């Protein structure tokens, strides 16, 4: 690298440092003083279910006053308690209302009633990366790299705030109208300065240290990035089997096989991300994220341009109008039932 290039790199590193310092200040203000609830169920017209989970659903809604479309996540308090997800749910809201990054879905409103908790997010009509990946089969390396770069920047941002994401997978990545990623579902995100021990995540994406019940840190997100890049470029994840236990055996074995079409740079990056030895895993070494950002596979990536959303996306999802749901699957519709008496008031008093 010439002197000019070295100087440019140096000033970029400095401006990233400044950016993250300011971002932390903004985050901490909101983290320490979370925004009060600012809406109610009656403010929204419910349109269609976009997804369902073990303790709730996500619906497309229309805000009556502004006619804007949003995605409303509805969590049944009693089910959250039964599934021991109180802490996770409180984390999700507290984190979402405090973060601000181009590739994170925005929380616009939140509130609760006798039965449910509600989080109203911007609606991303392009649907999940998962459905596009399954339809296309696999993404070319440049296509996969475009998405991977956004996740790298997002993790750099989150980790600088001491946040671990813990739930990276194609189902949680929405493709917006410009073809960029919106990370959704902060149900497992957590603010951790040292290590944490909770077993959570999705089997195919779990890092070995989580499976082995060791204390773990932010490095689990970099492992998951390796799994995601592999799955985007191959069309299937690096470790898969019928039963979770068989998946776990493969993950901890430290053996990965690559399709013959993977470039040597891609294989090299993945060997460093899917590295069982934490003292060798990229993202977890003394240079931190820069080992990943300066890796040969990312040589053509203009990190600033990606952050500024100036790079042309490889794929723009098709949709007609802001309330179109054609990129989401159909689900059975169910009424939202609200009890006349308060449920689990104590558990969720801080929501």
From Swiss-Prot:
Q: What name does this protein carry? A: cAMP-dependent protein kinase catalytic subunit beta
Entry's EC annotation? 2.7.11.11
Give each disulfide bond as a residue pair.
Answer: none
* The reaction(s) this protein catalyses: L-seryl-[protein] + ATP = O-phospho-L-seryl-[protein] + ADP + H(+); L-threonyl-[protein] + ATP = O-phospho-L-threonyl-[protein] + ADP + H(+)
Q: How does it assemble?
A: A number of inactive tetrameric holoenzymes are produced by the combination of homo- or heterodimers of the different regulatory subunits associated with two catalytic subunits. cAMP causes the dissociation of the inactive holoenzyme into a dimer of regulatory subunits bound to four cAMP and two free monomeric catalytic subunits. Interacts with PRKAR1A and PRKAR2B. The cAMP-dependent protein kinase catalytic subunit binds PJA2. Interacts with GPKOW.
- Membrane topology, from the record: Lipid-anchor
Q: In what residue span(s) does the Protein kinase domain sit?
A: 44-298
Where does the sequence pass through the membrane?
A: none
Q: Which cofactor does it need?
A: Mg(2+)
Record carries keyword Nucleus? yes
Instruction: Using the record's annotations, give every residue carrying the modification Phosphotyrosine.
Output: 69, 331
Cross-referenced InterPro entries, in alphabetical order? AGC-kinase_C, Kinase-like_dom_sf, Prot_kinase_dom, Protein_kinase_ATP_BS, Ser/Thr_kinase_AS, STKc_PKA
Name the source organism: Sus scrofa (Pig)
- In the UniProt record, what gene is named as encoding this protein? PRKACB
Described purpose of this protein according to its UniProt entry: Mediates cAMP-dependent signaling triggered by receptor binding to GPCRs. PKA activation regulates diverse cellular processes such as cell proliferation, the cell cycle, differentiation and regulation of microtubule dynamics, chromatin condensation and decondensation, nuclear envelope disassembly and reassembly, as well as regulation of intracellular transport mechanisms and ion flux. Regulates the abundance of compartmentalized pools of its regulatory subunits through phosphorylation of PJA2 which binds and ubiquitinates these subunits, leading to their subsequent proteolysis.
Gene Ontology biological process = negative regulation of TORC1 signaling; protein phosphorylation; signal transduction
């Amino acid at each position: 690298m010439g002197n000019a290039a070295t100087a440019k790199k140096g000033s970029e590193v400095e401006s990233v440092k400044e950016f993250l310092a300011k971002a932390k200040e903004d985050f901490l203000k909101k983290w320490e003083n979370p925004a009060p609830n600012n809406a109610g169920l009656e403010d929204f017209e419910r349109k269609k279910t976009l997804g369902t989970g073990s303790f709730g659903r996500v619906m497309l809604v229309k805000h009556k006053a502004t006619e804007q479309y949003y995605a409303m996540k509805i969590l049944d308090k009693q089910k959250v308690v039964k599934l021991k997800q109180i802490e996770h749910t409180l984390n999700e809201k507290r984190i979402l209302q405090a973060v601000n990054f181009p590739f994170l879905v925005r929380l616009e409103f939140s509130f609760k009633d006798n039965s449910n908790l509600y989080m109203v997010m911007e609606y991303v009509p392009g649907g999940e990366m998962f459905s596009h990946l399954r339809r296309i089969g696999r993404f070319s390396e440049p296509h996969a790299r475009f998405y991977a770069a956004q996740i790298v920047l997002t993790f750099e941002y989150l980790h600088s705030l001491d946040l671990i994401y813990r739930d990276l997978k194609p189902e949680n990545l929405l493709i917006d109208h410009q073809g960029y990623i919106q990370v959704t579902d902060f149900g497992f995100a957590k603010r951790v300065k040292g290590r944490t021990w909770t077993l959570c995540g999705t089997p195919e994406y779990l890092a070995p240290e989580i499976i082995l019940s060791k204390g773990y840190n932010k490095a689990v997100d970099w492992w998951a990035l390796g799994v995601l890049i592999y799955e985007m470029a191959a069309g299937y994840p690096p470790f898969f089997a019928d039963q979770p236990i068989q998946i776990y055996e493969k993950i901890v074995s430290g053996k990965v096989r690559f399709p013959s079409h993977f470039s040597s740079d891609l294989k090299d990056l993945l060997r460093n991300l899917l590295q069982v030895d934490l003292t060798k895993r990229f993202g977890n070494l003394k240079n931190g994220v820069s080992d990943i950002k300066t890796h040969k596979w990312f040589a053509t990536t203009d990190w600033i341009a990606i952050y500024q959303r100036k790079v042309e996306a490889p794929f723009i999802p098709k949709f007609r109008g802001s309330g179109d749901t054609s990129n989401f699957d159909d689900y059975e519709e169910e009424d939202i039932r609200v009890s006349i008496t308060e449920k689990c008031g104590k558990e969720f008093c801080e929501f």
